[in-house]
């Protein structure tokens, strides 16, 4: 299911970040902060009235030719473009300014639902001025106070009322859906084109559930694939690539719809901090992952160099020790033949089910090899385990006391399950539960 997106927009100093933090911290329950961007507090994944959605905090929209103002305006325009609903925030202590009118013109052009929030209405007497905000032309304005958290419930009720129909995407169970993520200029579009040119069996370009997204069908090795949101890579181009904070949103949407995520790394420039953040999105979403080192033609690409590079990847991406690493060049097509088998293997692992009796044989053998830990004289007893979900494979281990399950022992059991059943390219989730 695609999450709706809410952008908070307005001129500088109307309290956008205060409202964002108030919504994130108190008035709505945060499901999780989207990983890797917590420093900037640009995005949050949130829930209100059983609707899960993304909130975006934008920079202030301000006229001017200074590079910083142009960049902030450009970023806000991208957020508006991605949003399903826009919260237009104003400063109730200052009334409607000419700068607010300029923002309103921009929002009218978007043809998106706009909900007006008049911030800094800290006492009821100020509410008498609320009617002047009808003149903006967006319907009922909502008096709110970011400082005191007043009026936000009514505002959010209105916001979620504008969300598009959250119907489940119909996916063909026999088709593998995959996306490509990576920092700018890592070669995402080149790799898509290499896959398509090599195959030359594009059935059709199909509309994705995400607005403006084009998905591309592909058939290879007796398997149907869908490459998710190729439009995001092939059409949006430099504006999205240059404003990384906001282009991340499209990657998050693609990840949500994927079975397998290809995390692209540039062999020429090596591993960067941004690579880790991007990979973290896919890992935290529980998707199958293949690490793809592109531009392998630009470096000393012998077997020894490959092993050294993979060793470096393992050191930087310790939480992705399950992900296979594929080395290739989209430009020269070198080693392209290794990619599709890796995607298929990761997808198979992601959907694999293990019979309960076979699983418990492995668990009991593992315990015999490495006895369960004790805490304050009390020993952990593992009674039995069962698989409860796929995508990713998830297991519940029933025990006498979950508090006795140390992280290191949980990781030991997880690794034994992974090794025994060949889970490659997928995270595994293990939960200790007290037997009722």
From Swiss-Prot:
Entry keyword set: GTP-binding, Nucleotide-binding, Repeat, Ribosome biogenesis
Alphabetical list of Gene3D superfamilies matching this protein: 3.30.300.20, P-loop containing nucleotide triphosphate hydrolases (3.40.50.300)
Q: Which residues bind GTP 2?
A: 182-189, 229-233, 294-297
Instruction: State any GO BP term from the record.
Output: ribosome biogenesis
Q: Where does GTP 1 bind?
A: 10-17, 57-61, 119-122
Superkingdom of the source?
Bacteria
Which residue range or ranges hold the EngA-type G domain?
4-167, 176-351
Record domain KH-like: where? 352-436
Q: Name one GO molecular function term.
A: GTP binding
One Pfam family this chain carries? KH_dom-like
Q: What does this protein do?
A: GTPase that plays an essential role in the late steps of ribosome biogenesis.
Assembly, per entry? Associates with the 50S ribosomal subunit.
Q: Which family does it belong to?
A: Belongs to the TRAFAC class TrmE-Era-EngA-EngB-Septin-like GTPase superfamily. EngA (Der) GTPase family.
PANTHER family linked to this entry: GTPASE DER (PTHR43834:SF6)
Report the protein name in the record: GTPase Der
* Source species taxonomy: Bacteria, Bacillati, Bacillota, Bacilli, Bacillales
């Amino acid at each position: 299911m695609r999450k709706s997106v809410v952008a908070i927009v307005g001129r500088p100093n109307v309290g956008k970040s205060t409202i964002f933090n108030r919504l994130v911290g108190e008035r709505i329950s945060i499901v999780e902060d989207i990983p890797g961007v917590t420093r900037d507090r640009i995005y949050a994944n949130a829930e209100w009235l059983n609707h899960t959605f993304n909130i975006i905090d934008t920079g202030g929209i301000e006229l001017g030719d200074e590079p910083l103002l142009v960049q902030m305006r450009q970023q806000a325009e991208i957020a508006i473009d991605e949003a399903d609903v826009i919260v237009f925030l104003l400063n109730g202590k200052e009334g409607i300014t000419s700068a607010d009118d300029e923002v309103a013109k921009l929002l009218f052009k978007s043809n998106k639902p706009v909900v007006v929030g008049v911030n800094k209405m800290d006492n009821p007497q100020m509410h008498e001025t609320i009617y002047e905000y009808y003149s903006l032309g967006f319907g009922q304005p909502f008096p709110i106070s970011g400082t005191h958290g007043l009026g936000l419930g009514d505002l959010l009720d209105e916001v979620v009322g504008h969300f598009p129909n959250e119907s489940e995407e119909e996916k063909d169970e026999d088709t593998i859906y995959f996306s490509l993520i990576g920092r700018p200029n890592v070669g995402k579009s080149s790799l898509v084109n290499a896959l398509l040119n090599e195959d030359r069996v594009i059935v059709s370009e199909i509309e994705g559930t995400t607005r403006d997204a084009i998905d591309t069908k592909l058939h290879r090795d007796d398997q149907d694939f869908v490459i998710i949101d190729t439009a995001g890579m092939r059409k949006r181009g430099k504006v999205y690539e240059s404003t990384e904070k906001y282009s991340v949103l499209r990657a998050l949407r693609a990840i949500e719809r994927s079975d397998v995520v290809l995390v692209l790394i540039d062999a020429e420039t090596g591993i960067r901090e941004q690579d880790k953040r991007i990979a973290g999105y896919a890992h935290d979403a529980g998707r199958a992952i293949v690490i793809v080192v592109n531009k392998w033609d630009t470096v000393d690409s012998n077997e020894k160099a490959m092993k050294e590079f993979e060793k470096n990847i393992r050191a930087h991406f310790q939480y992705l020790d399950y992900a296979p690493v594929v080395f290739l060049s989209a430009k020269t097509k070198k080693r392209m033949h290794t990619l599709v088998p890796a995607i298929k293997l990761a997808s198979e692992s992601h959907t694999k089910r293990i019979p309960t009796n076979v699983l418990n044989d492995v668990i009991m053998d593992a315990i015999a090899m490495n006895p369960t830990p004790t805490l304050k004289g009390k020993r952990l007893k593992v009674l039995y385990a069962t698989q409860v979900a796929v995508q990713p494979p998830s297991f519940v281990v029933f025990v006498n006391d979950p508090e006795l399950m140390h992280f290191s022992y949980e990781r030991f059991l997880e690794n034994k399950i992974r090794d025994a059943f060949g889970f490659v390219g997928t995270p595994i989730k293990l939960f200790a539960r007290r037997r009722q």
